[in-house]
Each structure stands twice: as C-alpha cells, then as structure tokens.
Swiss-Prot record:
Binding site for substrate: R117, R188
Species this chain originates from: Streptomyces avermitilis (strain ATCC 31267 / DSM 46492 / JCM 5070 / NBRC 14893 / NCIMB 12804 / NRRL 8165 / MA-4680)
Reported function: Catalyzes the conversion of 1-deoxypentalenic acid to 11-beta-hydroxy-1-deoxypentalenic acid in the biosynthesis of neopentalenolactone antibiotic.
Cited InterPro entries: DxPntBtaHylase, Phytyl_CoA_dOase-like
Gene that specifies this protein: ptlH
Further remarks about this protein from its record: S.avermitilis does not produce pentalenolactone itself in vivo but instead a group of new metabolites that are neopentalenolactone derivatives.
Enzyme Commission number: 1.14.11.35
Family assignment from sequence similarity: Belongs to the PhyH family.
Molecular function GO terms recorded: 2-oxoglutarate-dependent dioxygenase activity; iron ion binding; L-ascorbic acid binding
Name listed for the protein in its UniProt record: 1-deoxypentalenic acid 11-beta-hydroxylase
Biological process terms in GO annotation: antibiotic biosynthetic process; lactone biosynthetic process
Length: 285
C-alpha cells in the first residue's frame, strides 16, 4: 500500500464520550482532533521556528509564515534549531495538558524528546530530494521499553494535501510490531534508515491523510504504521512546519526516550543512526 485512499476521521465529537473515544482508538489506532489546542500558543511556536530559520541564515527575515521558505531541510543545523523552538513550554502548558488528559482519561507525562520539522516545497525542483523523510515505520519499534505511549503530531501552520504531513495505515497497529529493513532511499546523518516495506502494509489497512490547521492534533498508537508525505505544494507554495512528541500515562515506566531531550541524543557521537533519530539507544541500525 503506497497511495492515500482516504481522509482521517474527525474524532473531535467523541471527546466527551470516554467509551466511544477509546473504542475508536482501539479499532483504528489514531485520533484526529480539530481545533483543540490554543491557536495563539501554536502561532507563538511557529514564529519561534521562523525566527530560528532566520537567525541561522536560512530564511528571508521579512517573510511571513505563509511566505517562508528555505533552500533545503539539510542546509539548516537541526540541533541548533532546537534552541529556538520552546516546545516543552507548549506541550506542558495547562491548556495543552488538559487536552492530553482528555485523550488518556488520566494524568500524563510528556516525553522530553521532541522532533521539529521544517520542510520546503520540492515542487518544480530539478533535483528534488526526499531522502530525509521517513518511510513506513512504527515508533514503538525504536522507542520503549513500554509501548503505552502515543505519538502526538501537530502542524504549526496549515497543511494541504500537497504540502505533506503524515500518512497513517488505518488499523495497522492491531498486527503488532513488524520487521523494519534498511531502505537506501531514505537517509539521515548520511546513513540509510530502516522502514517497513510497503508490500508489508495490507490493502485493507487504508492509507489516510488530511489537510490540517493550527490547533489540530493527530495522535496515534506506538504500533501504527505511518510515513511522511513529501511537500510538493505550489499554489500556494508552503513550508511544512510541524513538531511531534510522545505522551504516556504518568504512572508508566519512563524509558530513555521519555527522559532524554532529542538534542542530547543527537550530539552523542557514540550512538548509531537510529539512536540519533529516535533518541533511544539501540543496536538496530
């Protein structure tokens, strides 16, 4: 399965119904919630990302969020960018935590590891490059040891069908962990990364993707098969600006990834490529 066949289901109306919310999540492995985050807080984080790209010489200082562009994702110091984006303050804001606890139905702990993404459009590029994106994978393959965390992905500016985002294989979490093999088409830090072969994602596990607005959340199970969709926006030409973290019940064990900022992992020269990407020590490369 490689092509998107449908939209996420809007689960926002289920927030007041514990049984219905949990039932949908158990069956489909994700929740798509619209306009549940403080949009002013989201815009503040988006502006911080813009300011970081400007400060590092990658973007026009006069560009608005809608006009912003950079030459390439890889031309920007990924570790340095984390100094500009105050994501921990956003995730742990009382209004954000309230939403997380509505989802879980209990107190939560937000991982100290956050990934930020700022992908320019490749539409019309003579030599488009998508190898920094992620192939089909499951976060639970690399992050643990407990698997009761959920990945929370948010756009910082609007996304369209063309500007990319996350494609989910509906219900794929129910088959548990799958084999991940090296994929030379996707590389980070100069090395190929592991992913799930598309042939291992069933036709019955329909691939879903929808446009999103600031204030929306896409969250999914540790075993959800998902992948990046490239940014090919051209009318308008938009950056894909987003960030994601993991959240788990406060009572659960807190593993390495939960307690270690991504930047600390990335700076550790002793770690292999997947450890740098996920923040989790691993022998699997």
């Amino acid at each position: 399965m490689t092509n998107v066949t449908g939209d996420y289901t809007d689960c926002t109306p289920l927030l007041g119904d514990r049984a219905a919310l949990d039932s949908f999540y158990e069956e489909h492995g994700y929740l798509f919630l619209r306009n549940v985050l403080d949009r002013d807080l989201v815009k503040t984080v988006a502006e911080q990302m813009r300011e970081g790209l400007v400060a590092l010489g990658a973007a026009d200082p006069h560009a608005t969020l809608e006009e912003l562009t950079i030459d390439s994702f890889e031309s920007v110091d990924e570790v340095a960018m984390h100094d500009y984006v105050k994501y921990d303050a956003f995730w742990n804001n009382p209004s954000t935590i309230k939403v997380f606890e509505q989802v879980f139905g209990e107190p939560v702990f937000v991982f100290l590891s956050t990934t930020i993404r700022y992908y320019p459009s490749q539409a019309g590029s003579e030599e488009p490059s998508f190898h920094y994106l992620t192939p089909f994978h499951q976060d639970g393959f690399y992050i643990g040891p407990n698997q009761d965390f959920r990945t929370f992905w948010i756009p910082l500016i609007r996304t369209t069908r063309e500007s990319g985002g996350v494609a989910l294989a509906d219900g794929s979490h129910r088959r548990g962990k799958r084999d991940h093999v090296l994929n030379e088409s996707f590389r980070r830090f100069g090395h190929p990364v592991r992913g799930i072969p598309p042939t291992e994602v069933s036709e019955d596990e329909h691939l879903l993707h929808s446009p999103m607005e600031p204030g929306d959340i896409l969250l999914f199970h540790a075993h959800m098969c998902h992948k990046s969709i490239p940014n090919l926006s051209k009318d308008p030409r938009l950056m894909r600006m987003s960030m994601d973290t993991r959240v788990q019940p406060a009572k659960s064990h807190r593993g390495f990834n939960a307690m270690t900022p991504w930047t600390e992992s990335a700076k550790d020269a002793s770690k292999g490529i997947m450890a740098k990407i996920t923040g989790t020590p691993t022998d699997v490369e």
